[in-house]
């Protein structure tokens, strides 16, 4: 919109013409009427771009601190263990990008090529993109309103040159915010396989996961399943399991049974996970015999099977 004020929510936003920043704008009445809204041409551009990506997976969480970014990183690592599988990891946690640190890519920068932004590669078959690569320092704060965040996500989806990719893993911020709405809107025409939702066993975390599940239902986003992280601690010496965060209401298992949502698995606590993330290395390499590694591998296999079954179903619908 010409003459739009700073903080403009955009003509296609639910707050168009009604937000606080709209007061005094010459376009306020036009936006409020809905006449100024028009289909975003970026949606079609992104659909074309995503034709080279076979599967798209969102990783969500109701709360911060439940291990969502750690899971996203290790999901990407696990999928990429097959050298013939091309994997991309996109970090859209705009205000809290931790993927560069976890993947050992701090200090890397984005490079522009003739076909778009080039991802930063961990391995030949594992590329990463994050707003963290655009910051001069990892300690810099990103203080952006919704429209600017949405523009950044649009640019990531439209302008990053992933090439032919089997899996695109998208790490999102906690909760249900502008970033989630934007990525679902922009990828709607391109098809999203589904979402993996992270939680811990406590009811205070599960309460927000129920909101996340409600969000998925409202925006028609398929749910691959729930992962219960920090599910227990297995002593490396005696092999006995202790509940560090005991589930007060039955944990993720009881919630999934009540809501008829698949429980993909439970990942126990392992001190090596945090150490691996701090060093920017794969936990699977650091602790291949850990019960947490076995839990991760089982969960990743279930996600892979879900995506393959969705692809087979879609191909059957398309075939004559």
UniProtKB/Swiss-Prot annotation:
GO terms for cellular component: centriole; centrosome; cilium; cytosol; Golgi apparatus; nucleus. It comes from the Eukaryota. [4Fe-4S] cluster 1 binds at residues 8, 22, 25, 31. Keywords: 4Fe-4S, Acetylation, ATP-binding, Cell projection, Cilium, Cilium biogenesis/degradation, Cytoplasm, Cytoskeleton, Iron, Iron-sulfur, Metal-binding, Nucleotide-binding, Nucleus, Phosphoprotein. The keyword Transmembrane helix does not apply. PANTHER family: CYTOSOLIC FE-S CLUSTER ASSEMBLY FACTOR NUBP1, NUCLEOTIDE-BINDING PROTEIN NBP35 YEAST -RELATED. [4Fe-4S] cluster 2 binds at residues 235, 238. Heterotetramer of 2 NUBP1 and 2 NUBP2 chains. Interacts with KIFC1. Interacts with the BBS/CCT complex subunit CCT1. Binds 4 [4Fe-4S] clusters per heterotetramer. Contains two stable clusters in the N-termini of NUBP1 and two labile, bridging clusters between subunits of the NUBP1-NUBP2 heterotetramer. Component of the cytosolic iron-sulfur (Fe/S) protein assembly (CIA) machinery. Required for maturation of extramitochondrial Fe-S proteins. The NUBP1-NUBP2 heterotetramer forms a Fe-S scaffold complex, mediating the de novo assembly of an Fe-S cluster and its transfer to target apoproteins. Implicated in the regulation of centrosome duplication. Negatively regulates cilium formation and structure. It comes from Rattus norvegicus. The modification Phosphoserine is found at residue 319. ATP binds at residues 62-69. It is found in: Cytoplasm; Nucleus; Cell projection; Cytoplasm, Cytoskeleton, Cilium axoneme. The modification N-acetylmethionine is found at residue 1. The lineage of its organism: Eukaryota, Metazoa, Chordata, Craniata, Vertebrata. This is Cytosolic Fe-S cluster assembly factor NUBP1. One of its GO terms (biological process) is centrosome localization. Belongs to the Mrp/NBP35 ATP-binding proteins family. NUBP1/NBP35 subfamily. One of its GO terms (molecular function) is iron-sulfur cluster binding.
């Amino acid at each position: 919109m010409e003459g739009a004020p700073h903080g403009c929510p955009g003509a296609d936003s639910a707050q168009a013409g009604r937000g606080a920043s709209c007061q005094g704008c010459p376009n306020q009445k036009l936006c409020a009427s809905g006449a100024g809204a028009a289909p975003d041409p970026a949606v079609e551009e992104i659909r074309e771009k995503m034709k080279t990506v076979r599967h798209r997976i969102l990783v969500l969480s109701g709360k911060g601190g439940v291990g969502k970014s750690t899971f996203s990183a290790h999901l990407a690592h696990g999928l990429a263990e097959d050298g013939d599988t091309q994997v991309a990891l996109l970090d859209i946690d705009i205000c809290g990008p931790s993927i560069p640190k976890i993947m050992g890519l701090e200090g890397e920068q984005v490079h522009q090529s003739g076909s778009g932004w080039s991802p930063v590669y961990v391995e030949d078959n594992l590329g990463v993109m994050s707003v963290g690569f655009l910051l001069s320092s990892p300690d810099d704060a990103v203080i952006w309103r919704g429209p600017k965040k949405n523009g950044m996500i649009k640019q990531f989806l439209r302008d990053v040159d992933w090439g032919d990719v089997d899996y695109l893993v998208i790490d999102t911020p906690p909760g249900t915010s502008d970033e989630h709405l934007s990525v679902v809107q922009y990828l709607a025409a391109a098809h999203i396989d589904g979402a993996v939702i992270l939680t811990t066993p406590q009811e205070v975390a599960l309460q927000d996961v129920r909101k996340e599940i409600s969000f998925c239902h409202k925006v028609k986003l398929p749910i691959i399943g729930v992962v219960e992280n920090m599910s227990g601690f297995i002593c490396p010496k005696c092999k006995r399991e202790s509940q560090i965060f005991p589930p007060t209401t039955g944990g993720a298992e009881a919630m999934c049974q009540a809501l008829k949502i698949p429980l993909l698995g439970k990942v126990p606590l392992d001190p090596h996970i945090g150490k691996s993330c701090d060093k920017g290395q794969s936990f699977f390499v650091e602790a291949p015999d850990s019960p947490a590694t076995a839990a991760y591998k089982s969960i990743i296999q279930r996600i892979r099977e879900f995506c393959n079954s969705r692809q087979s179903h879609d191909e059957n619908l398309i075939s004559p």
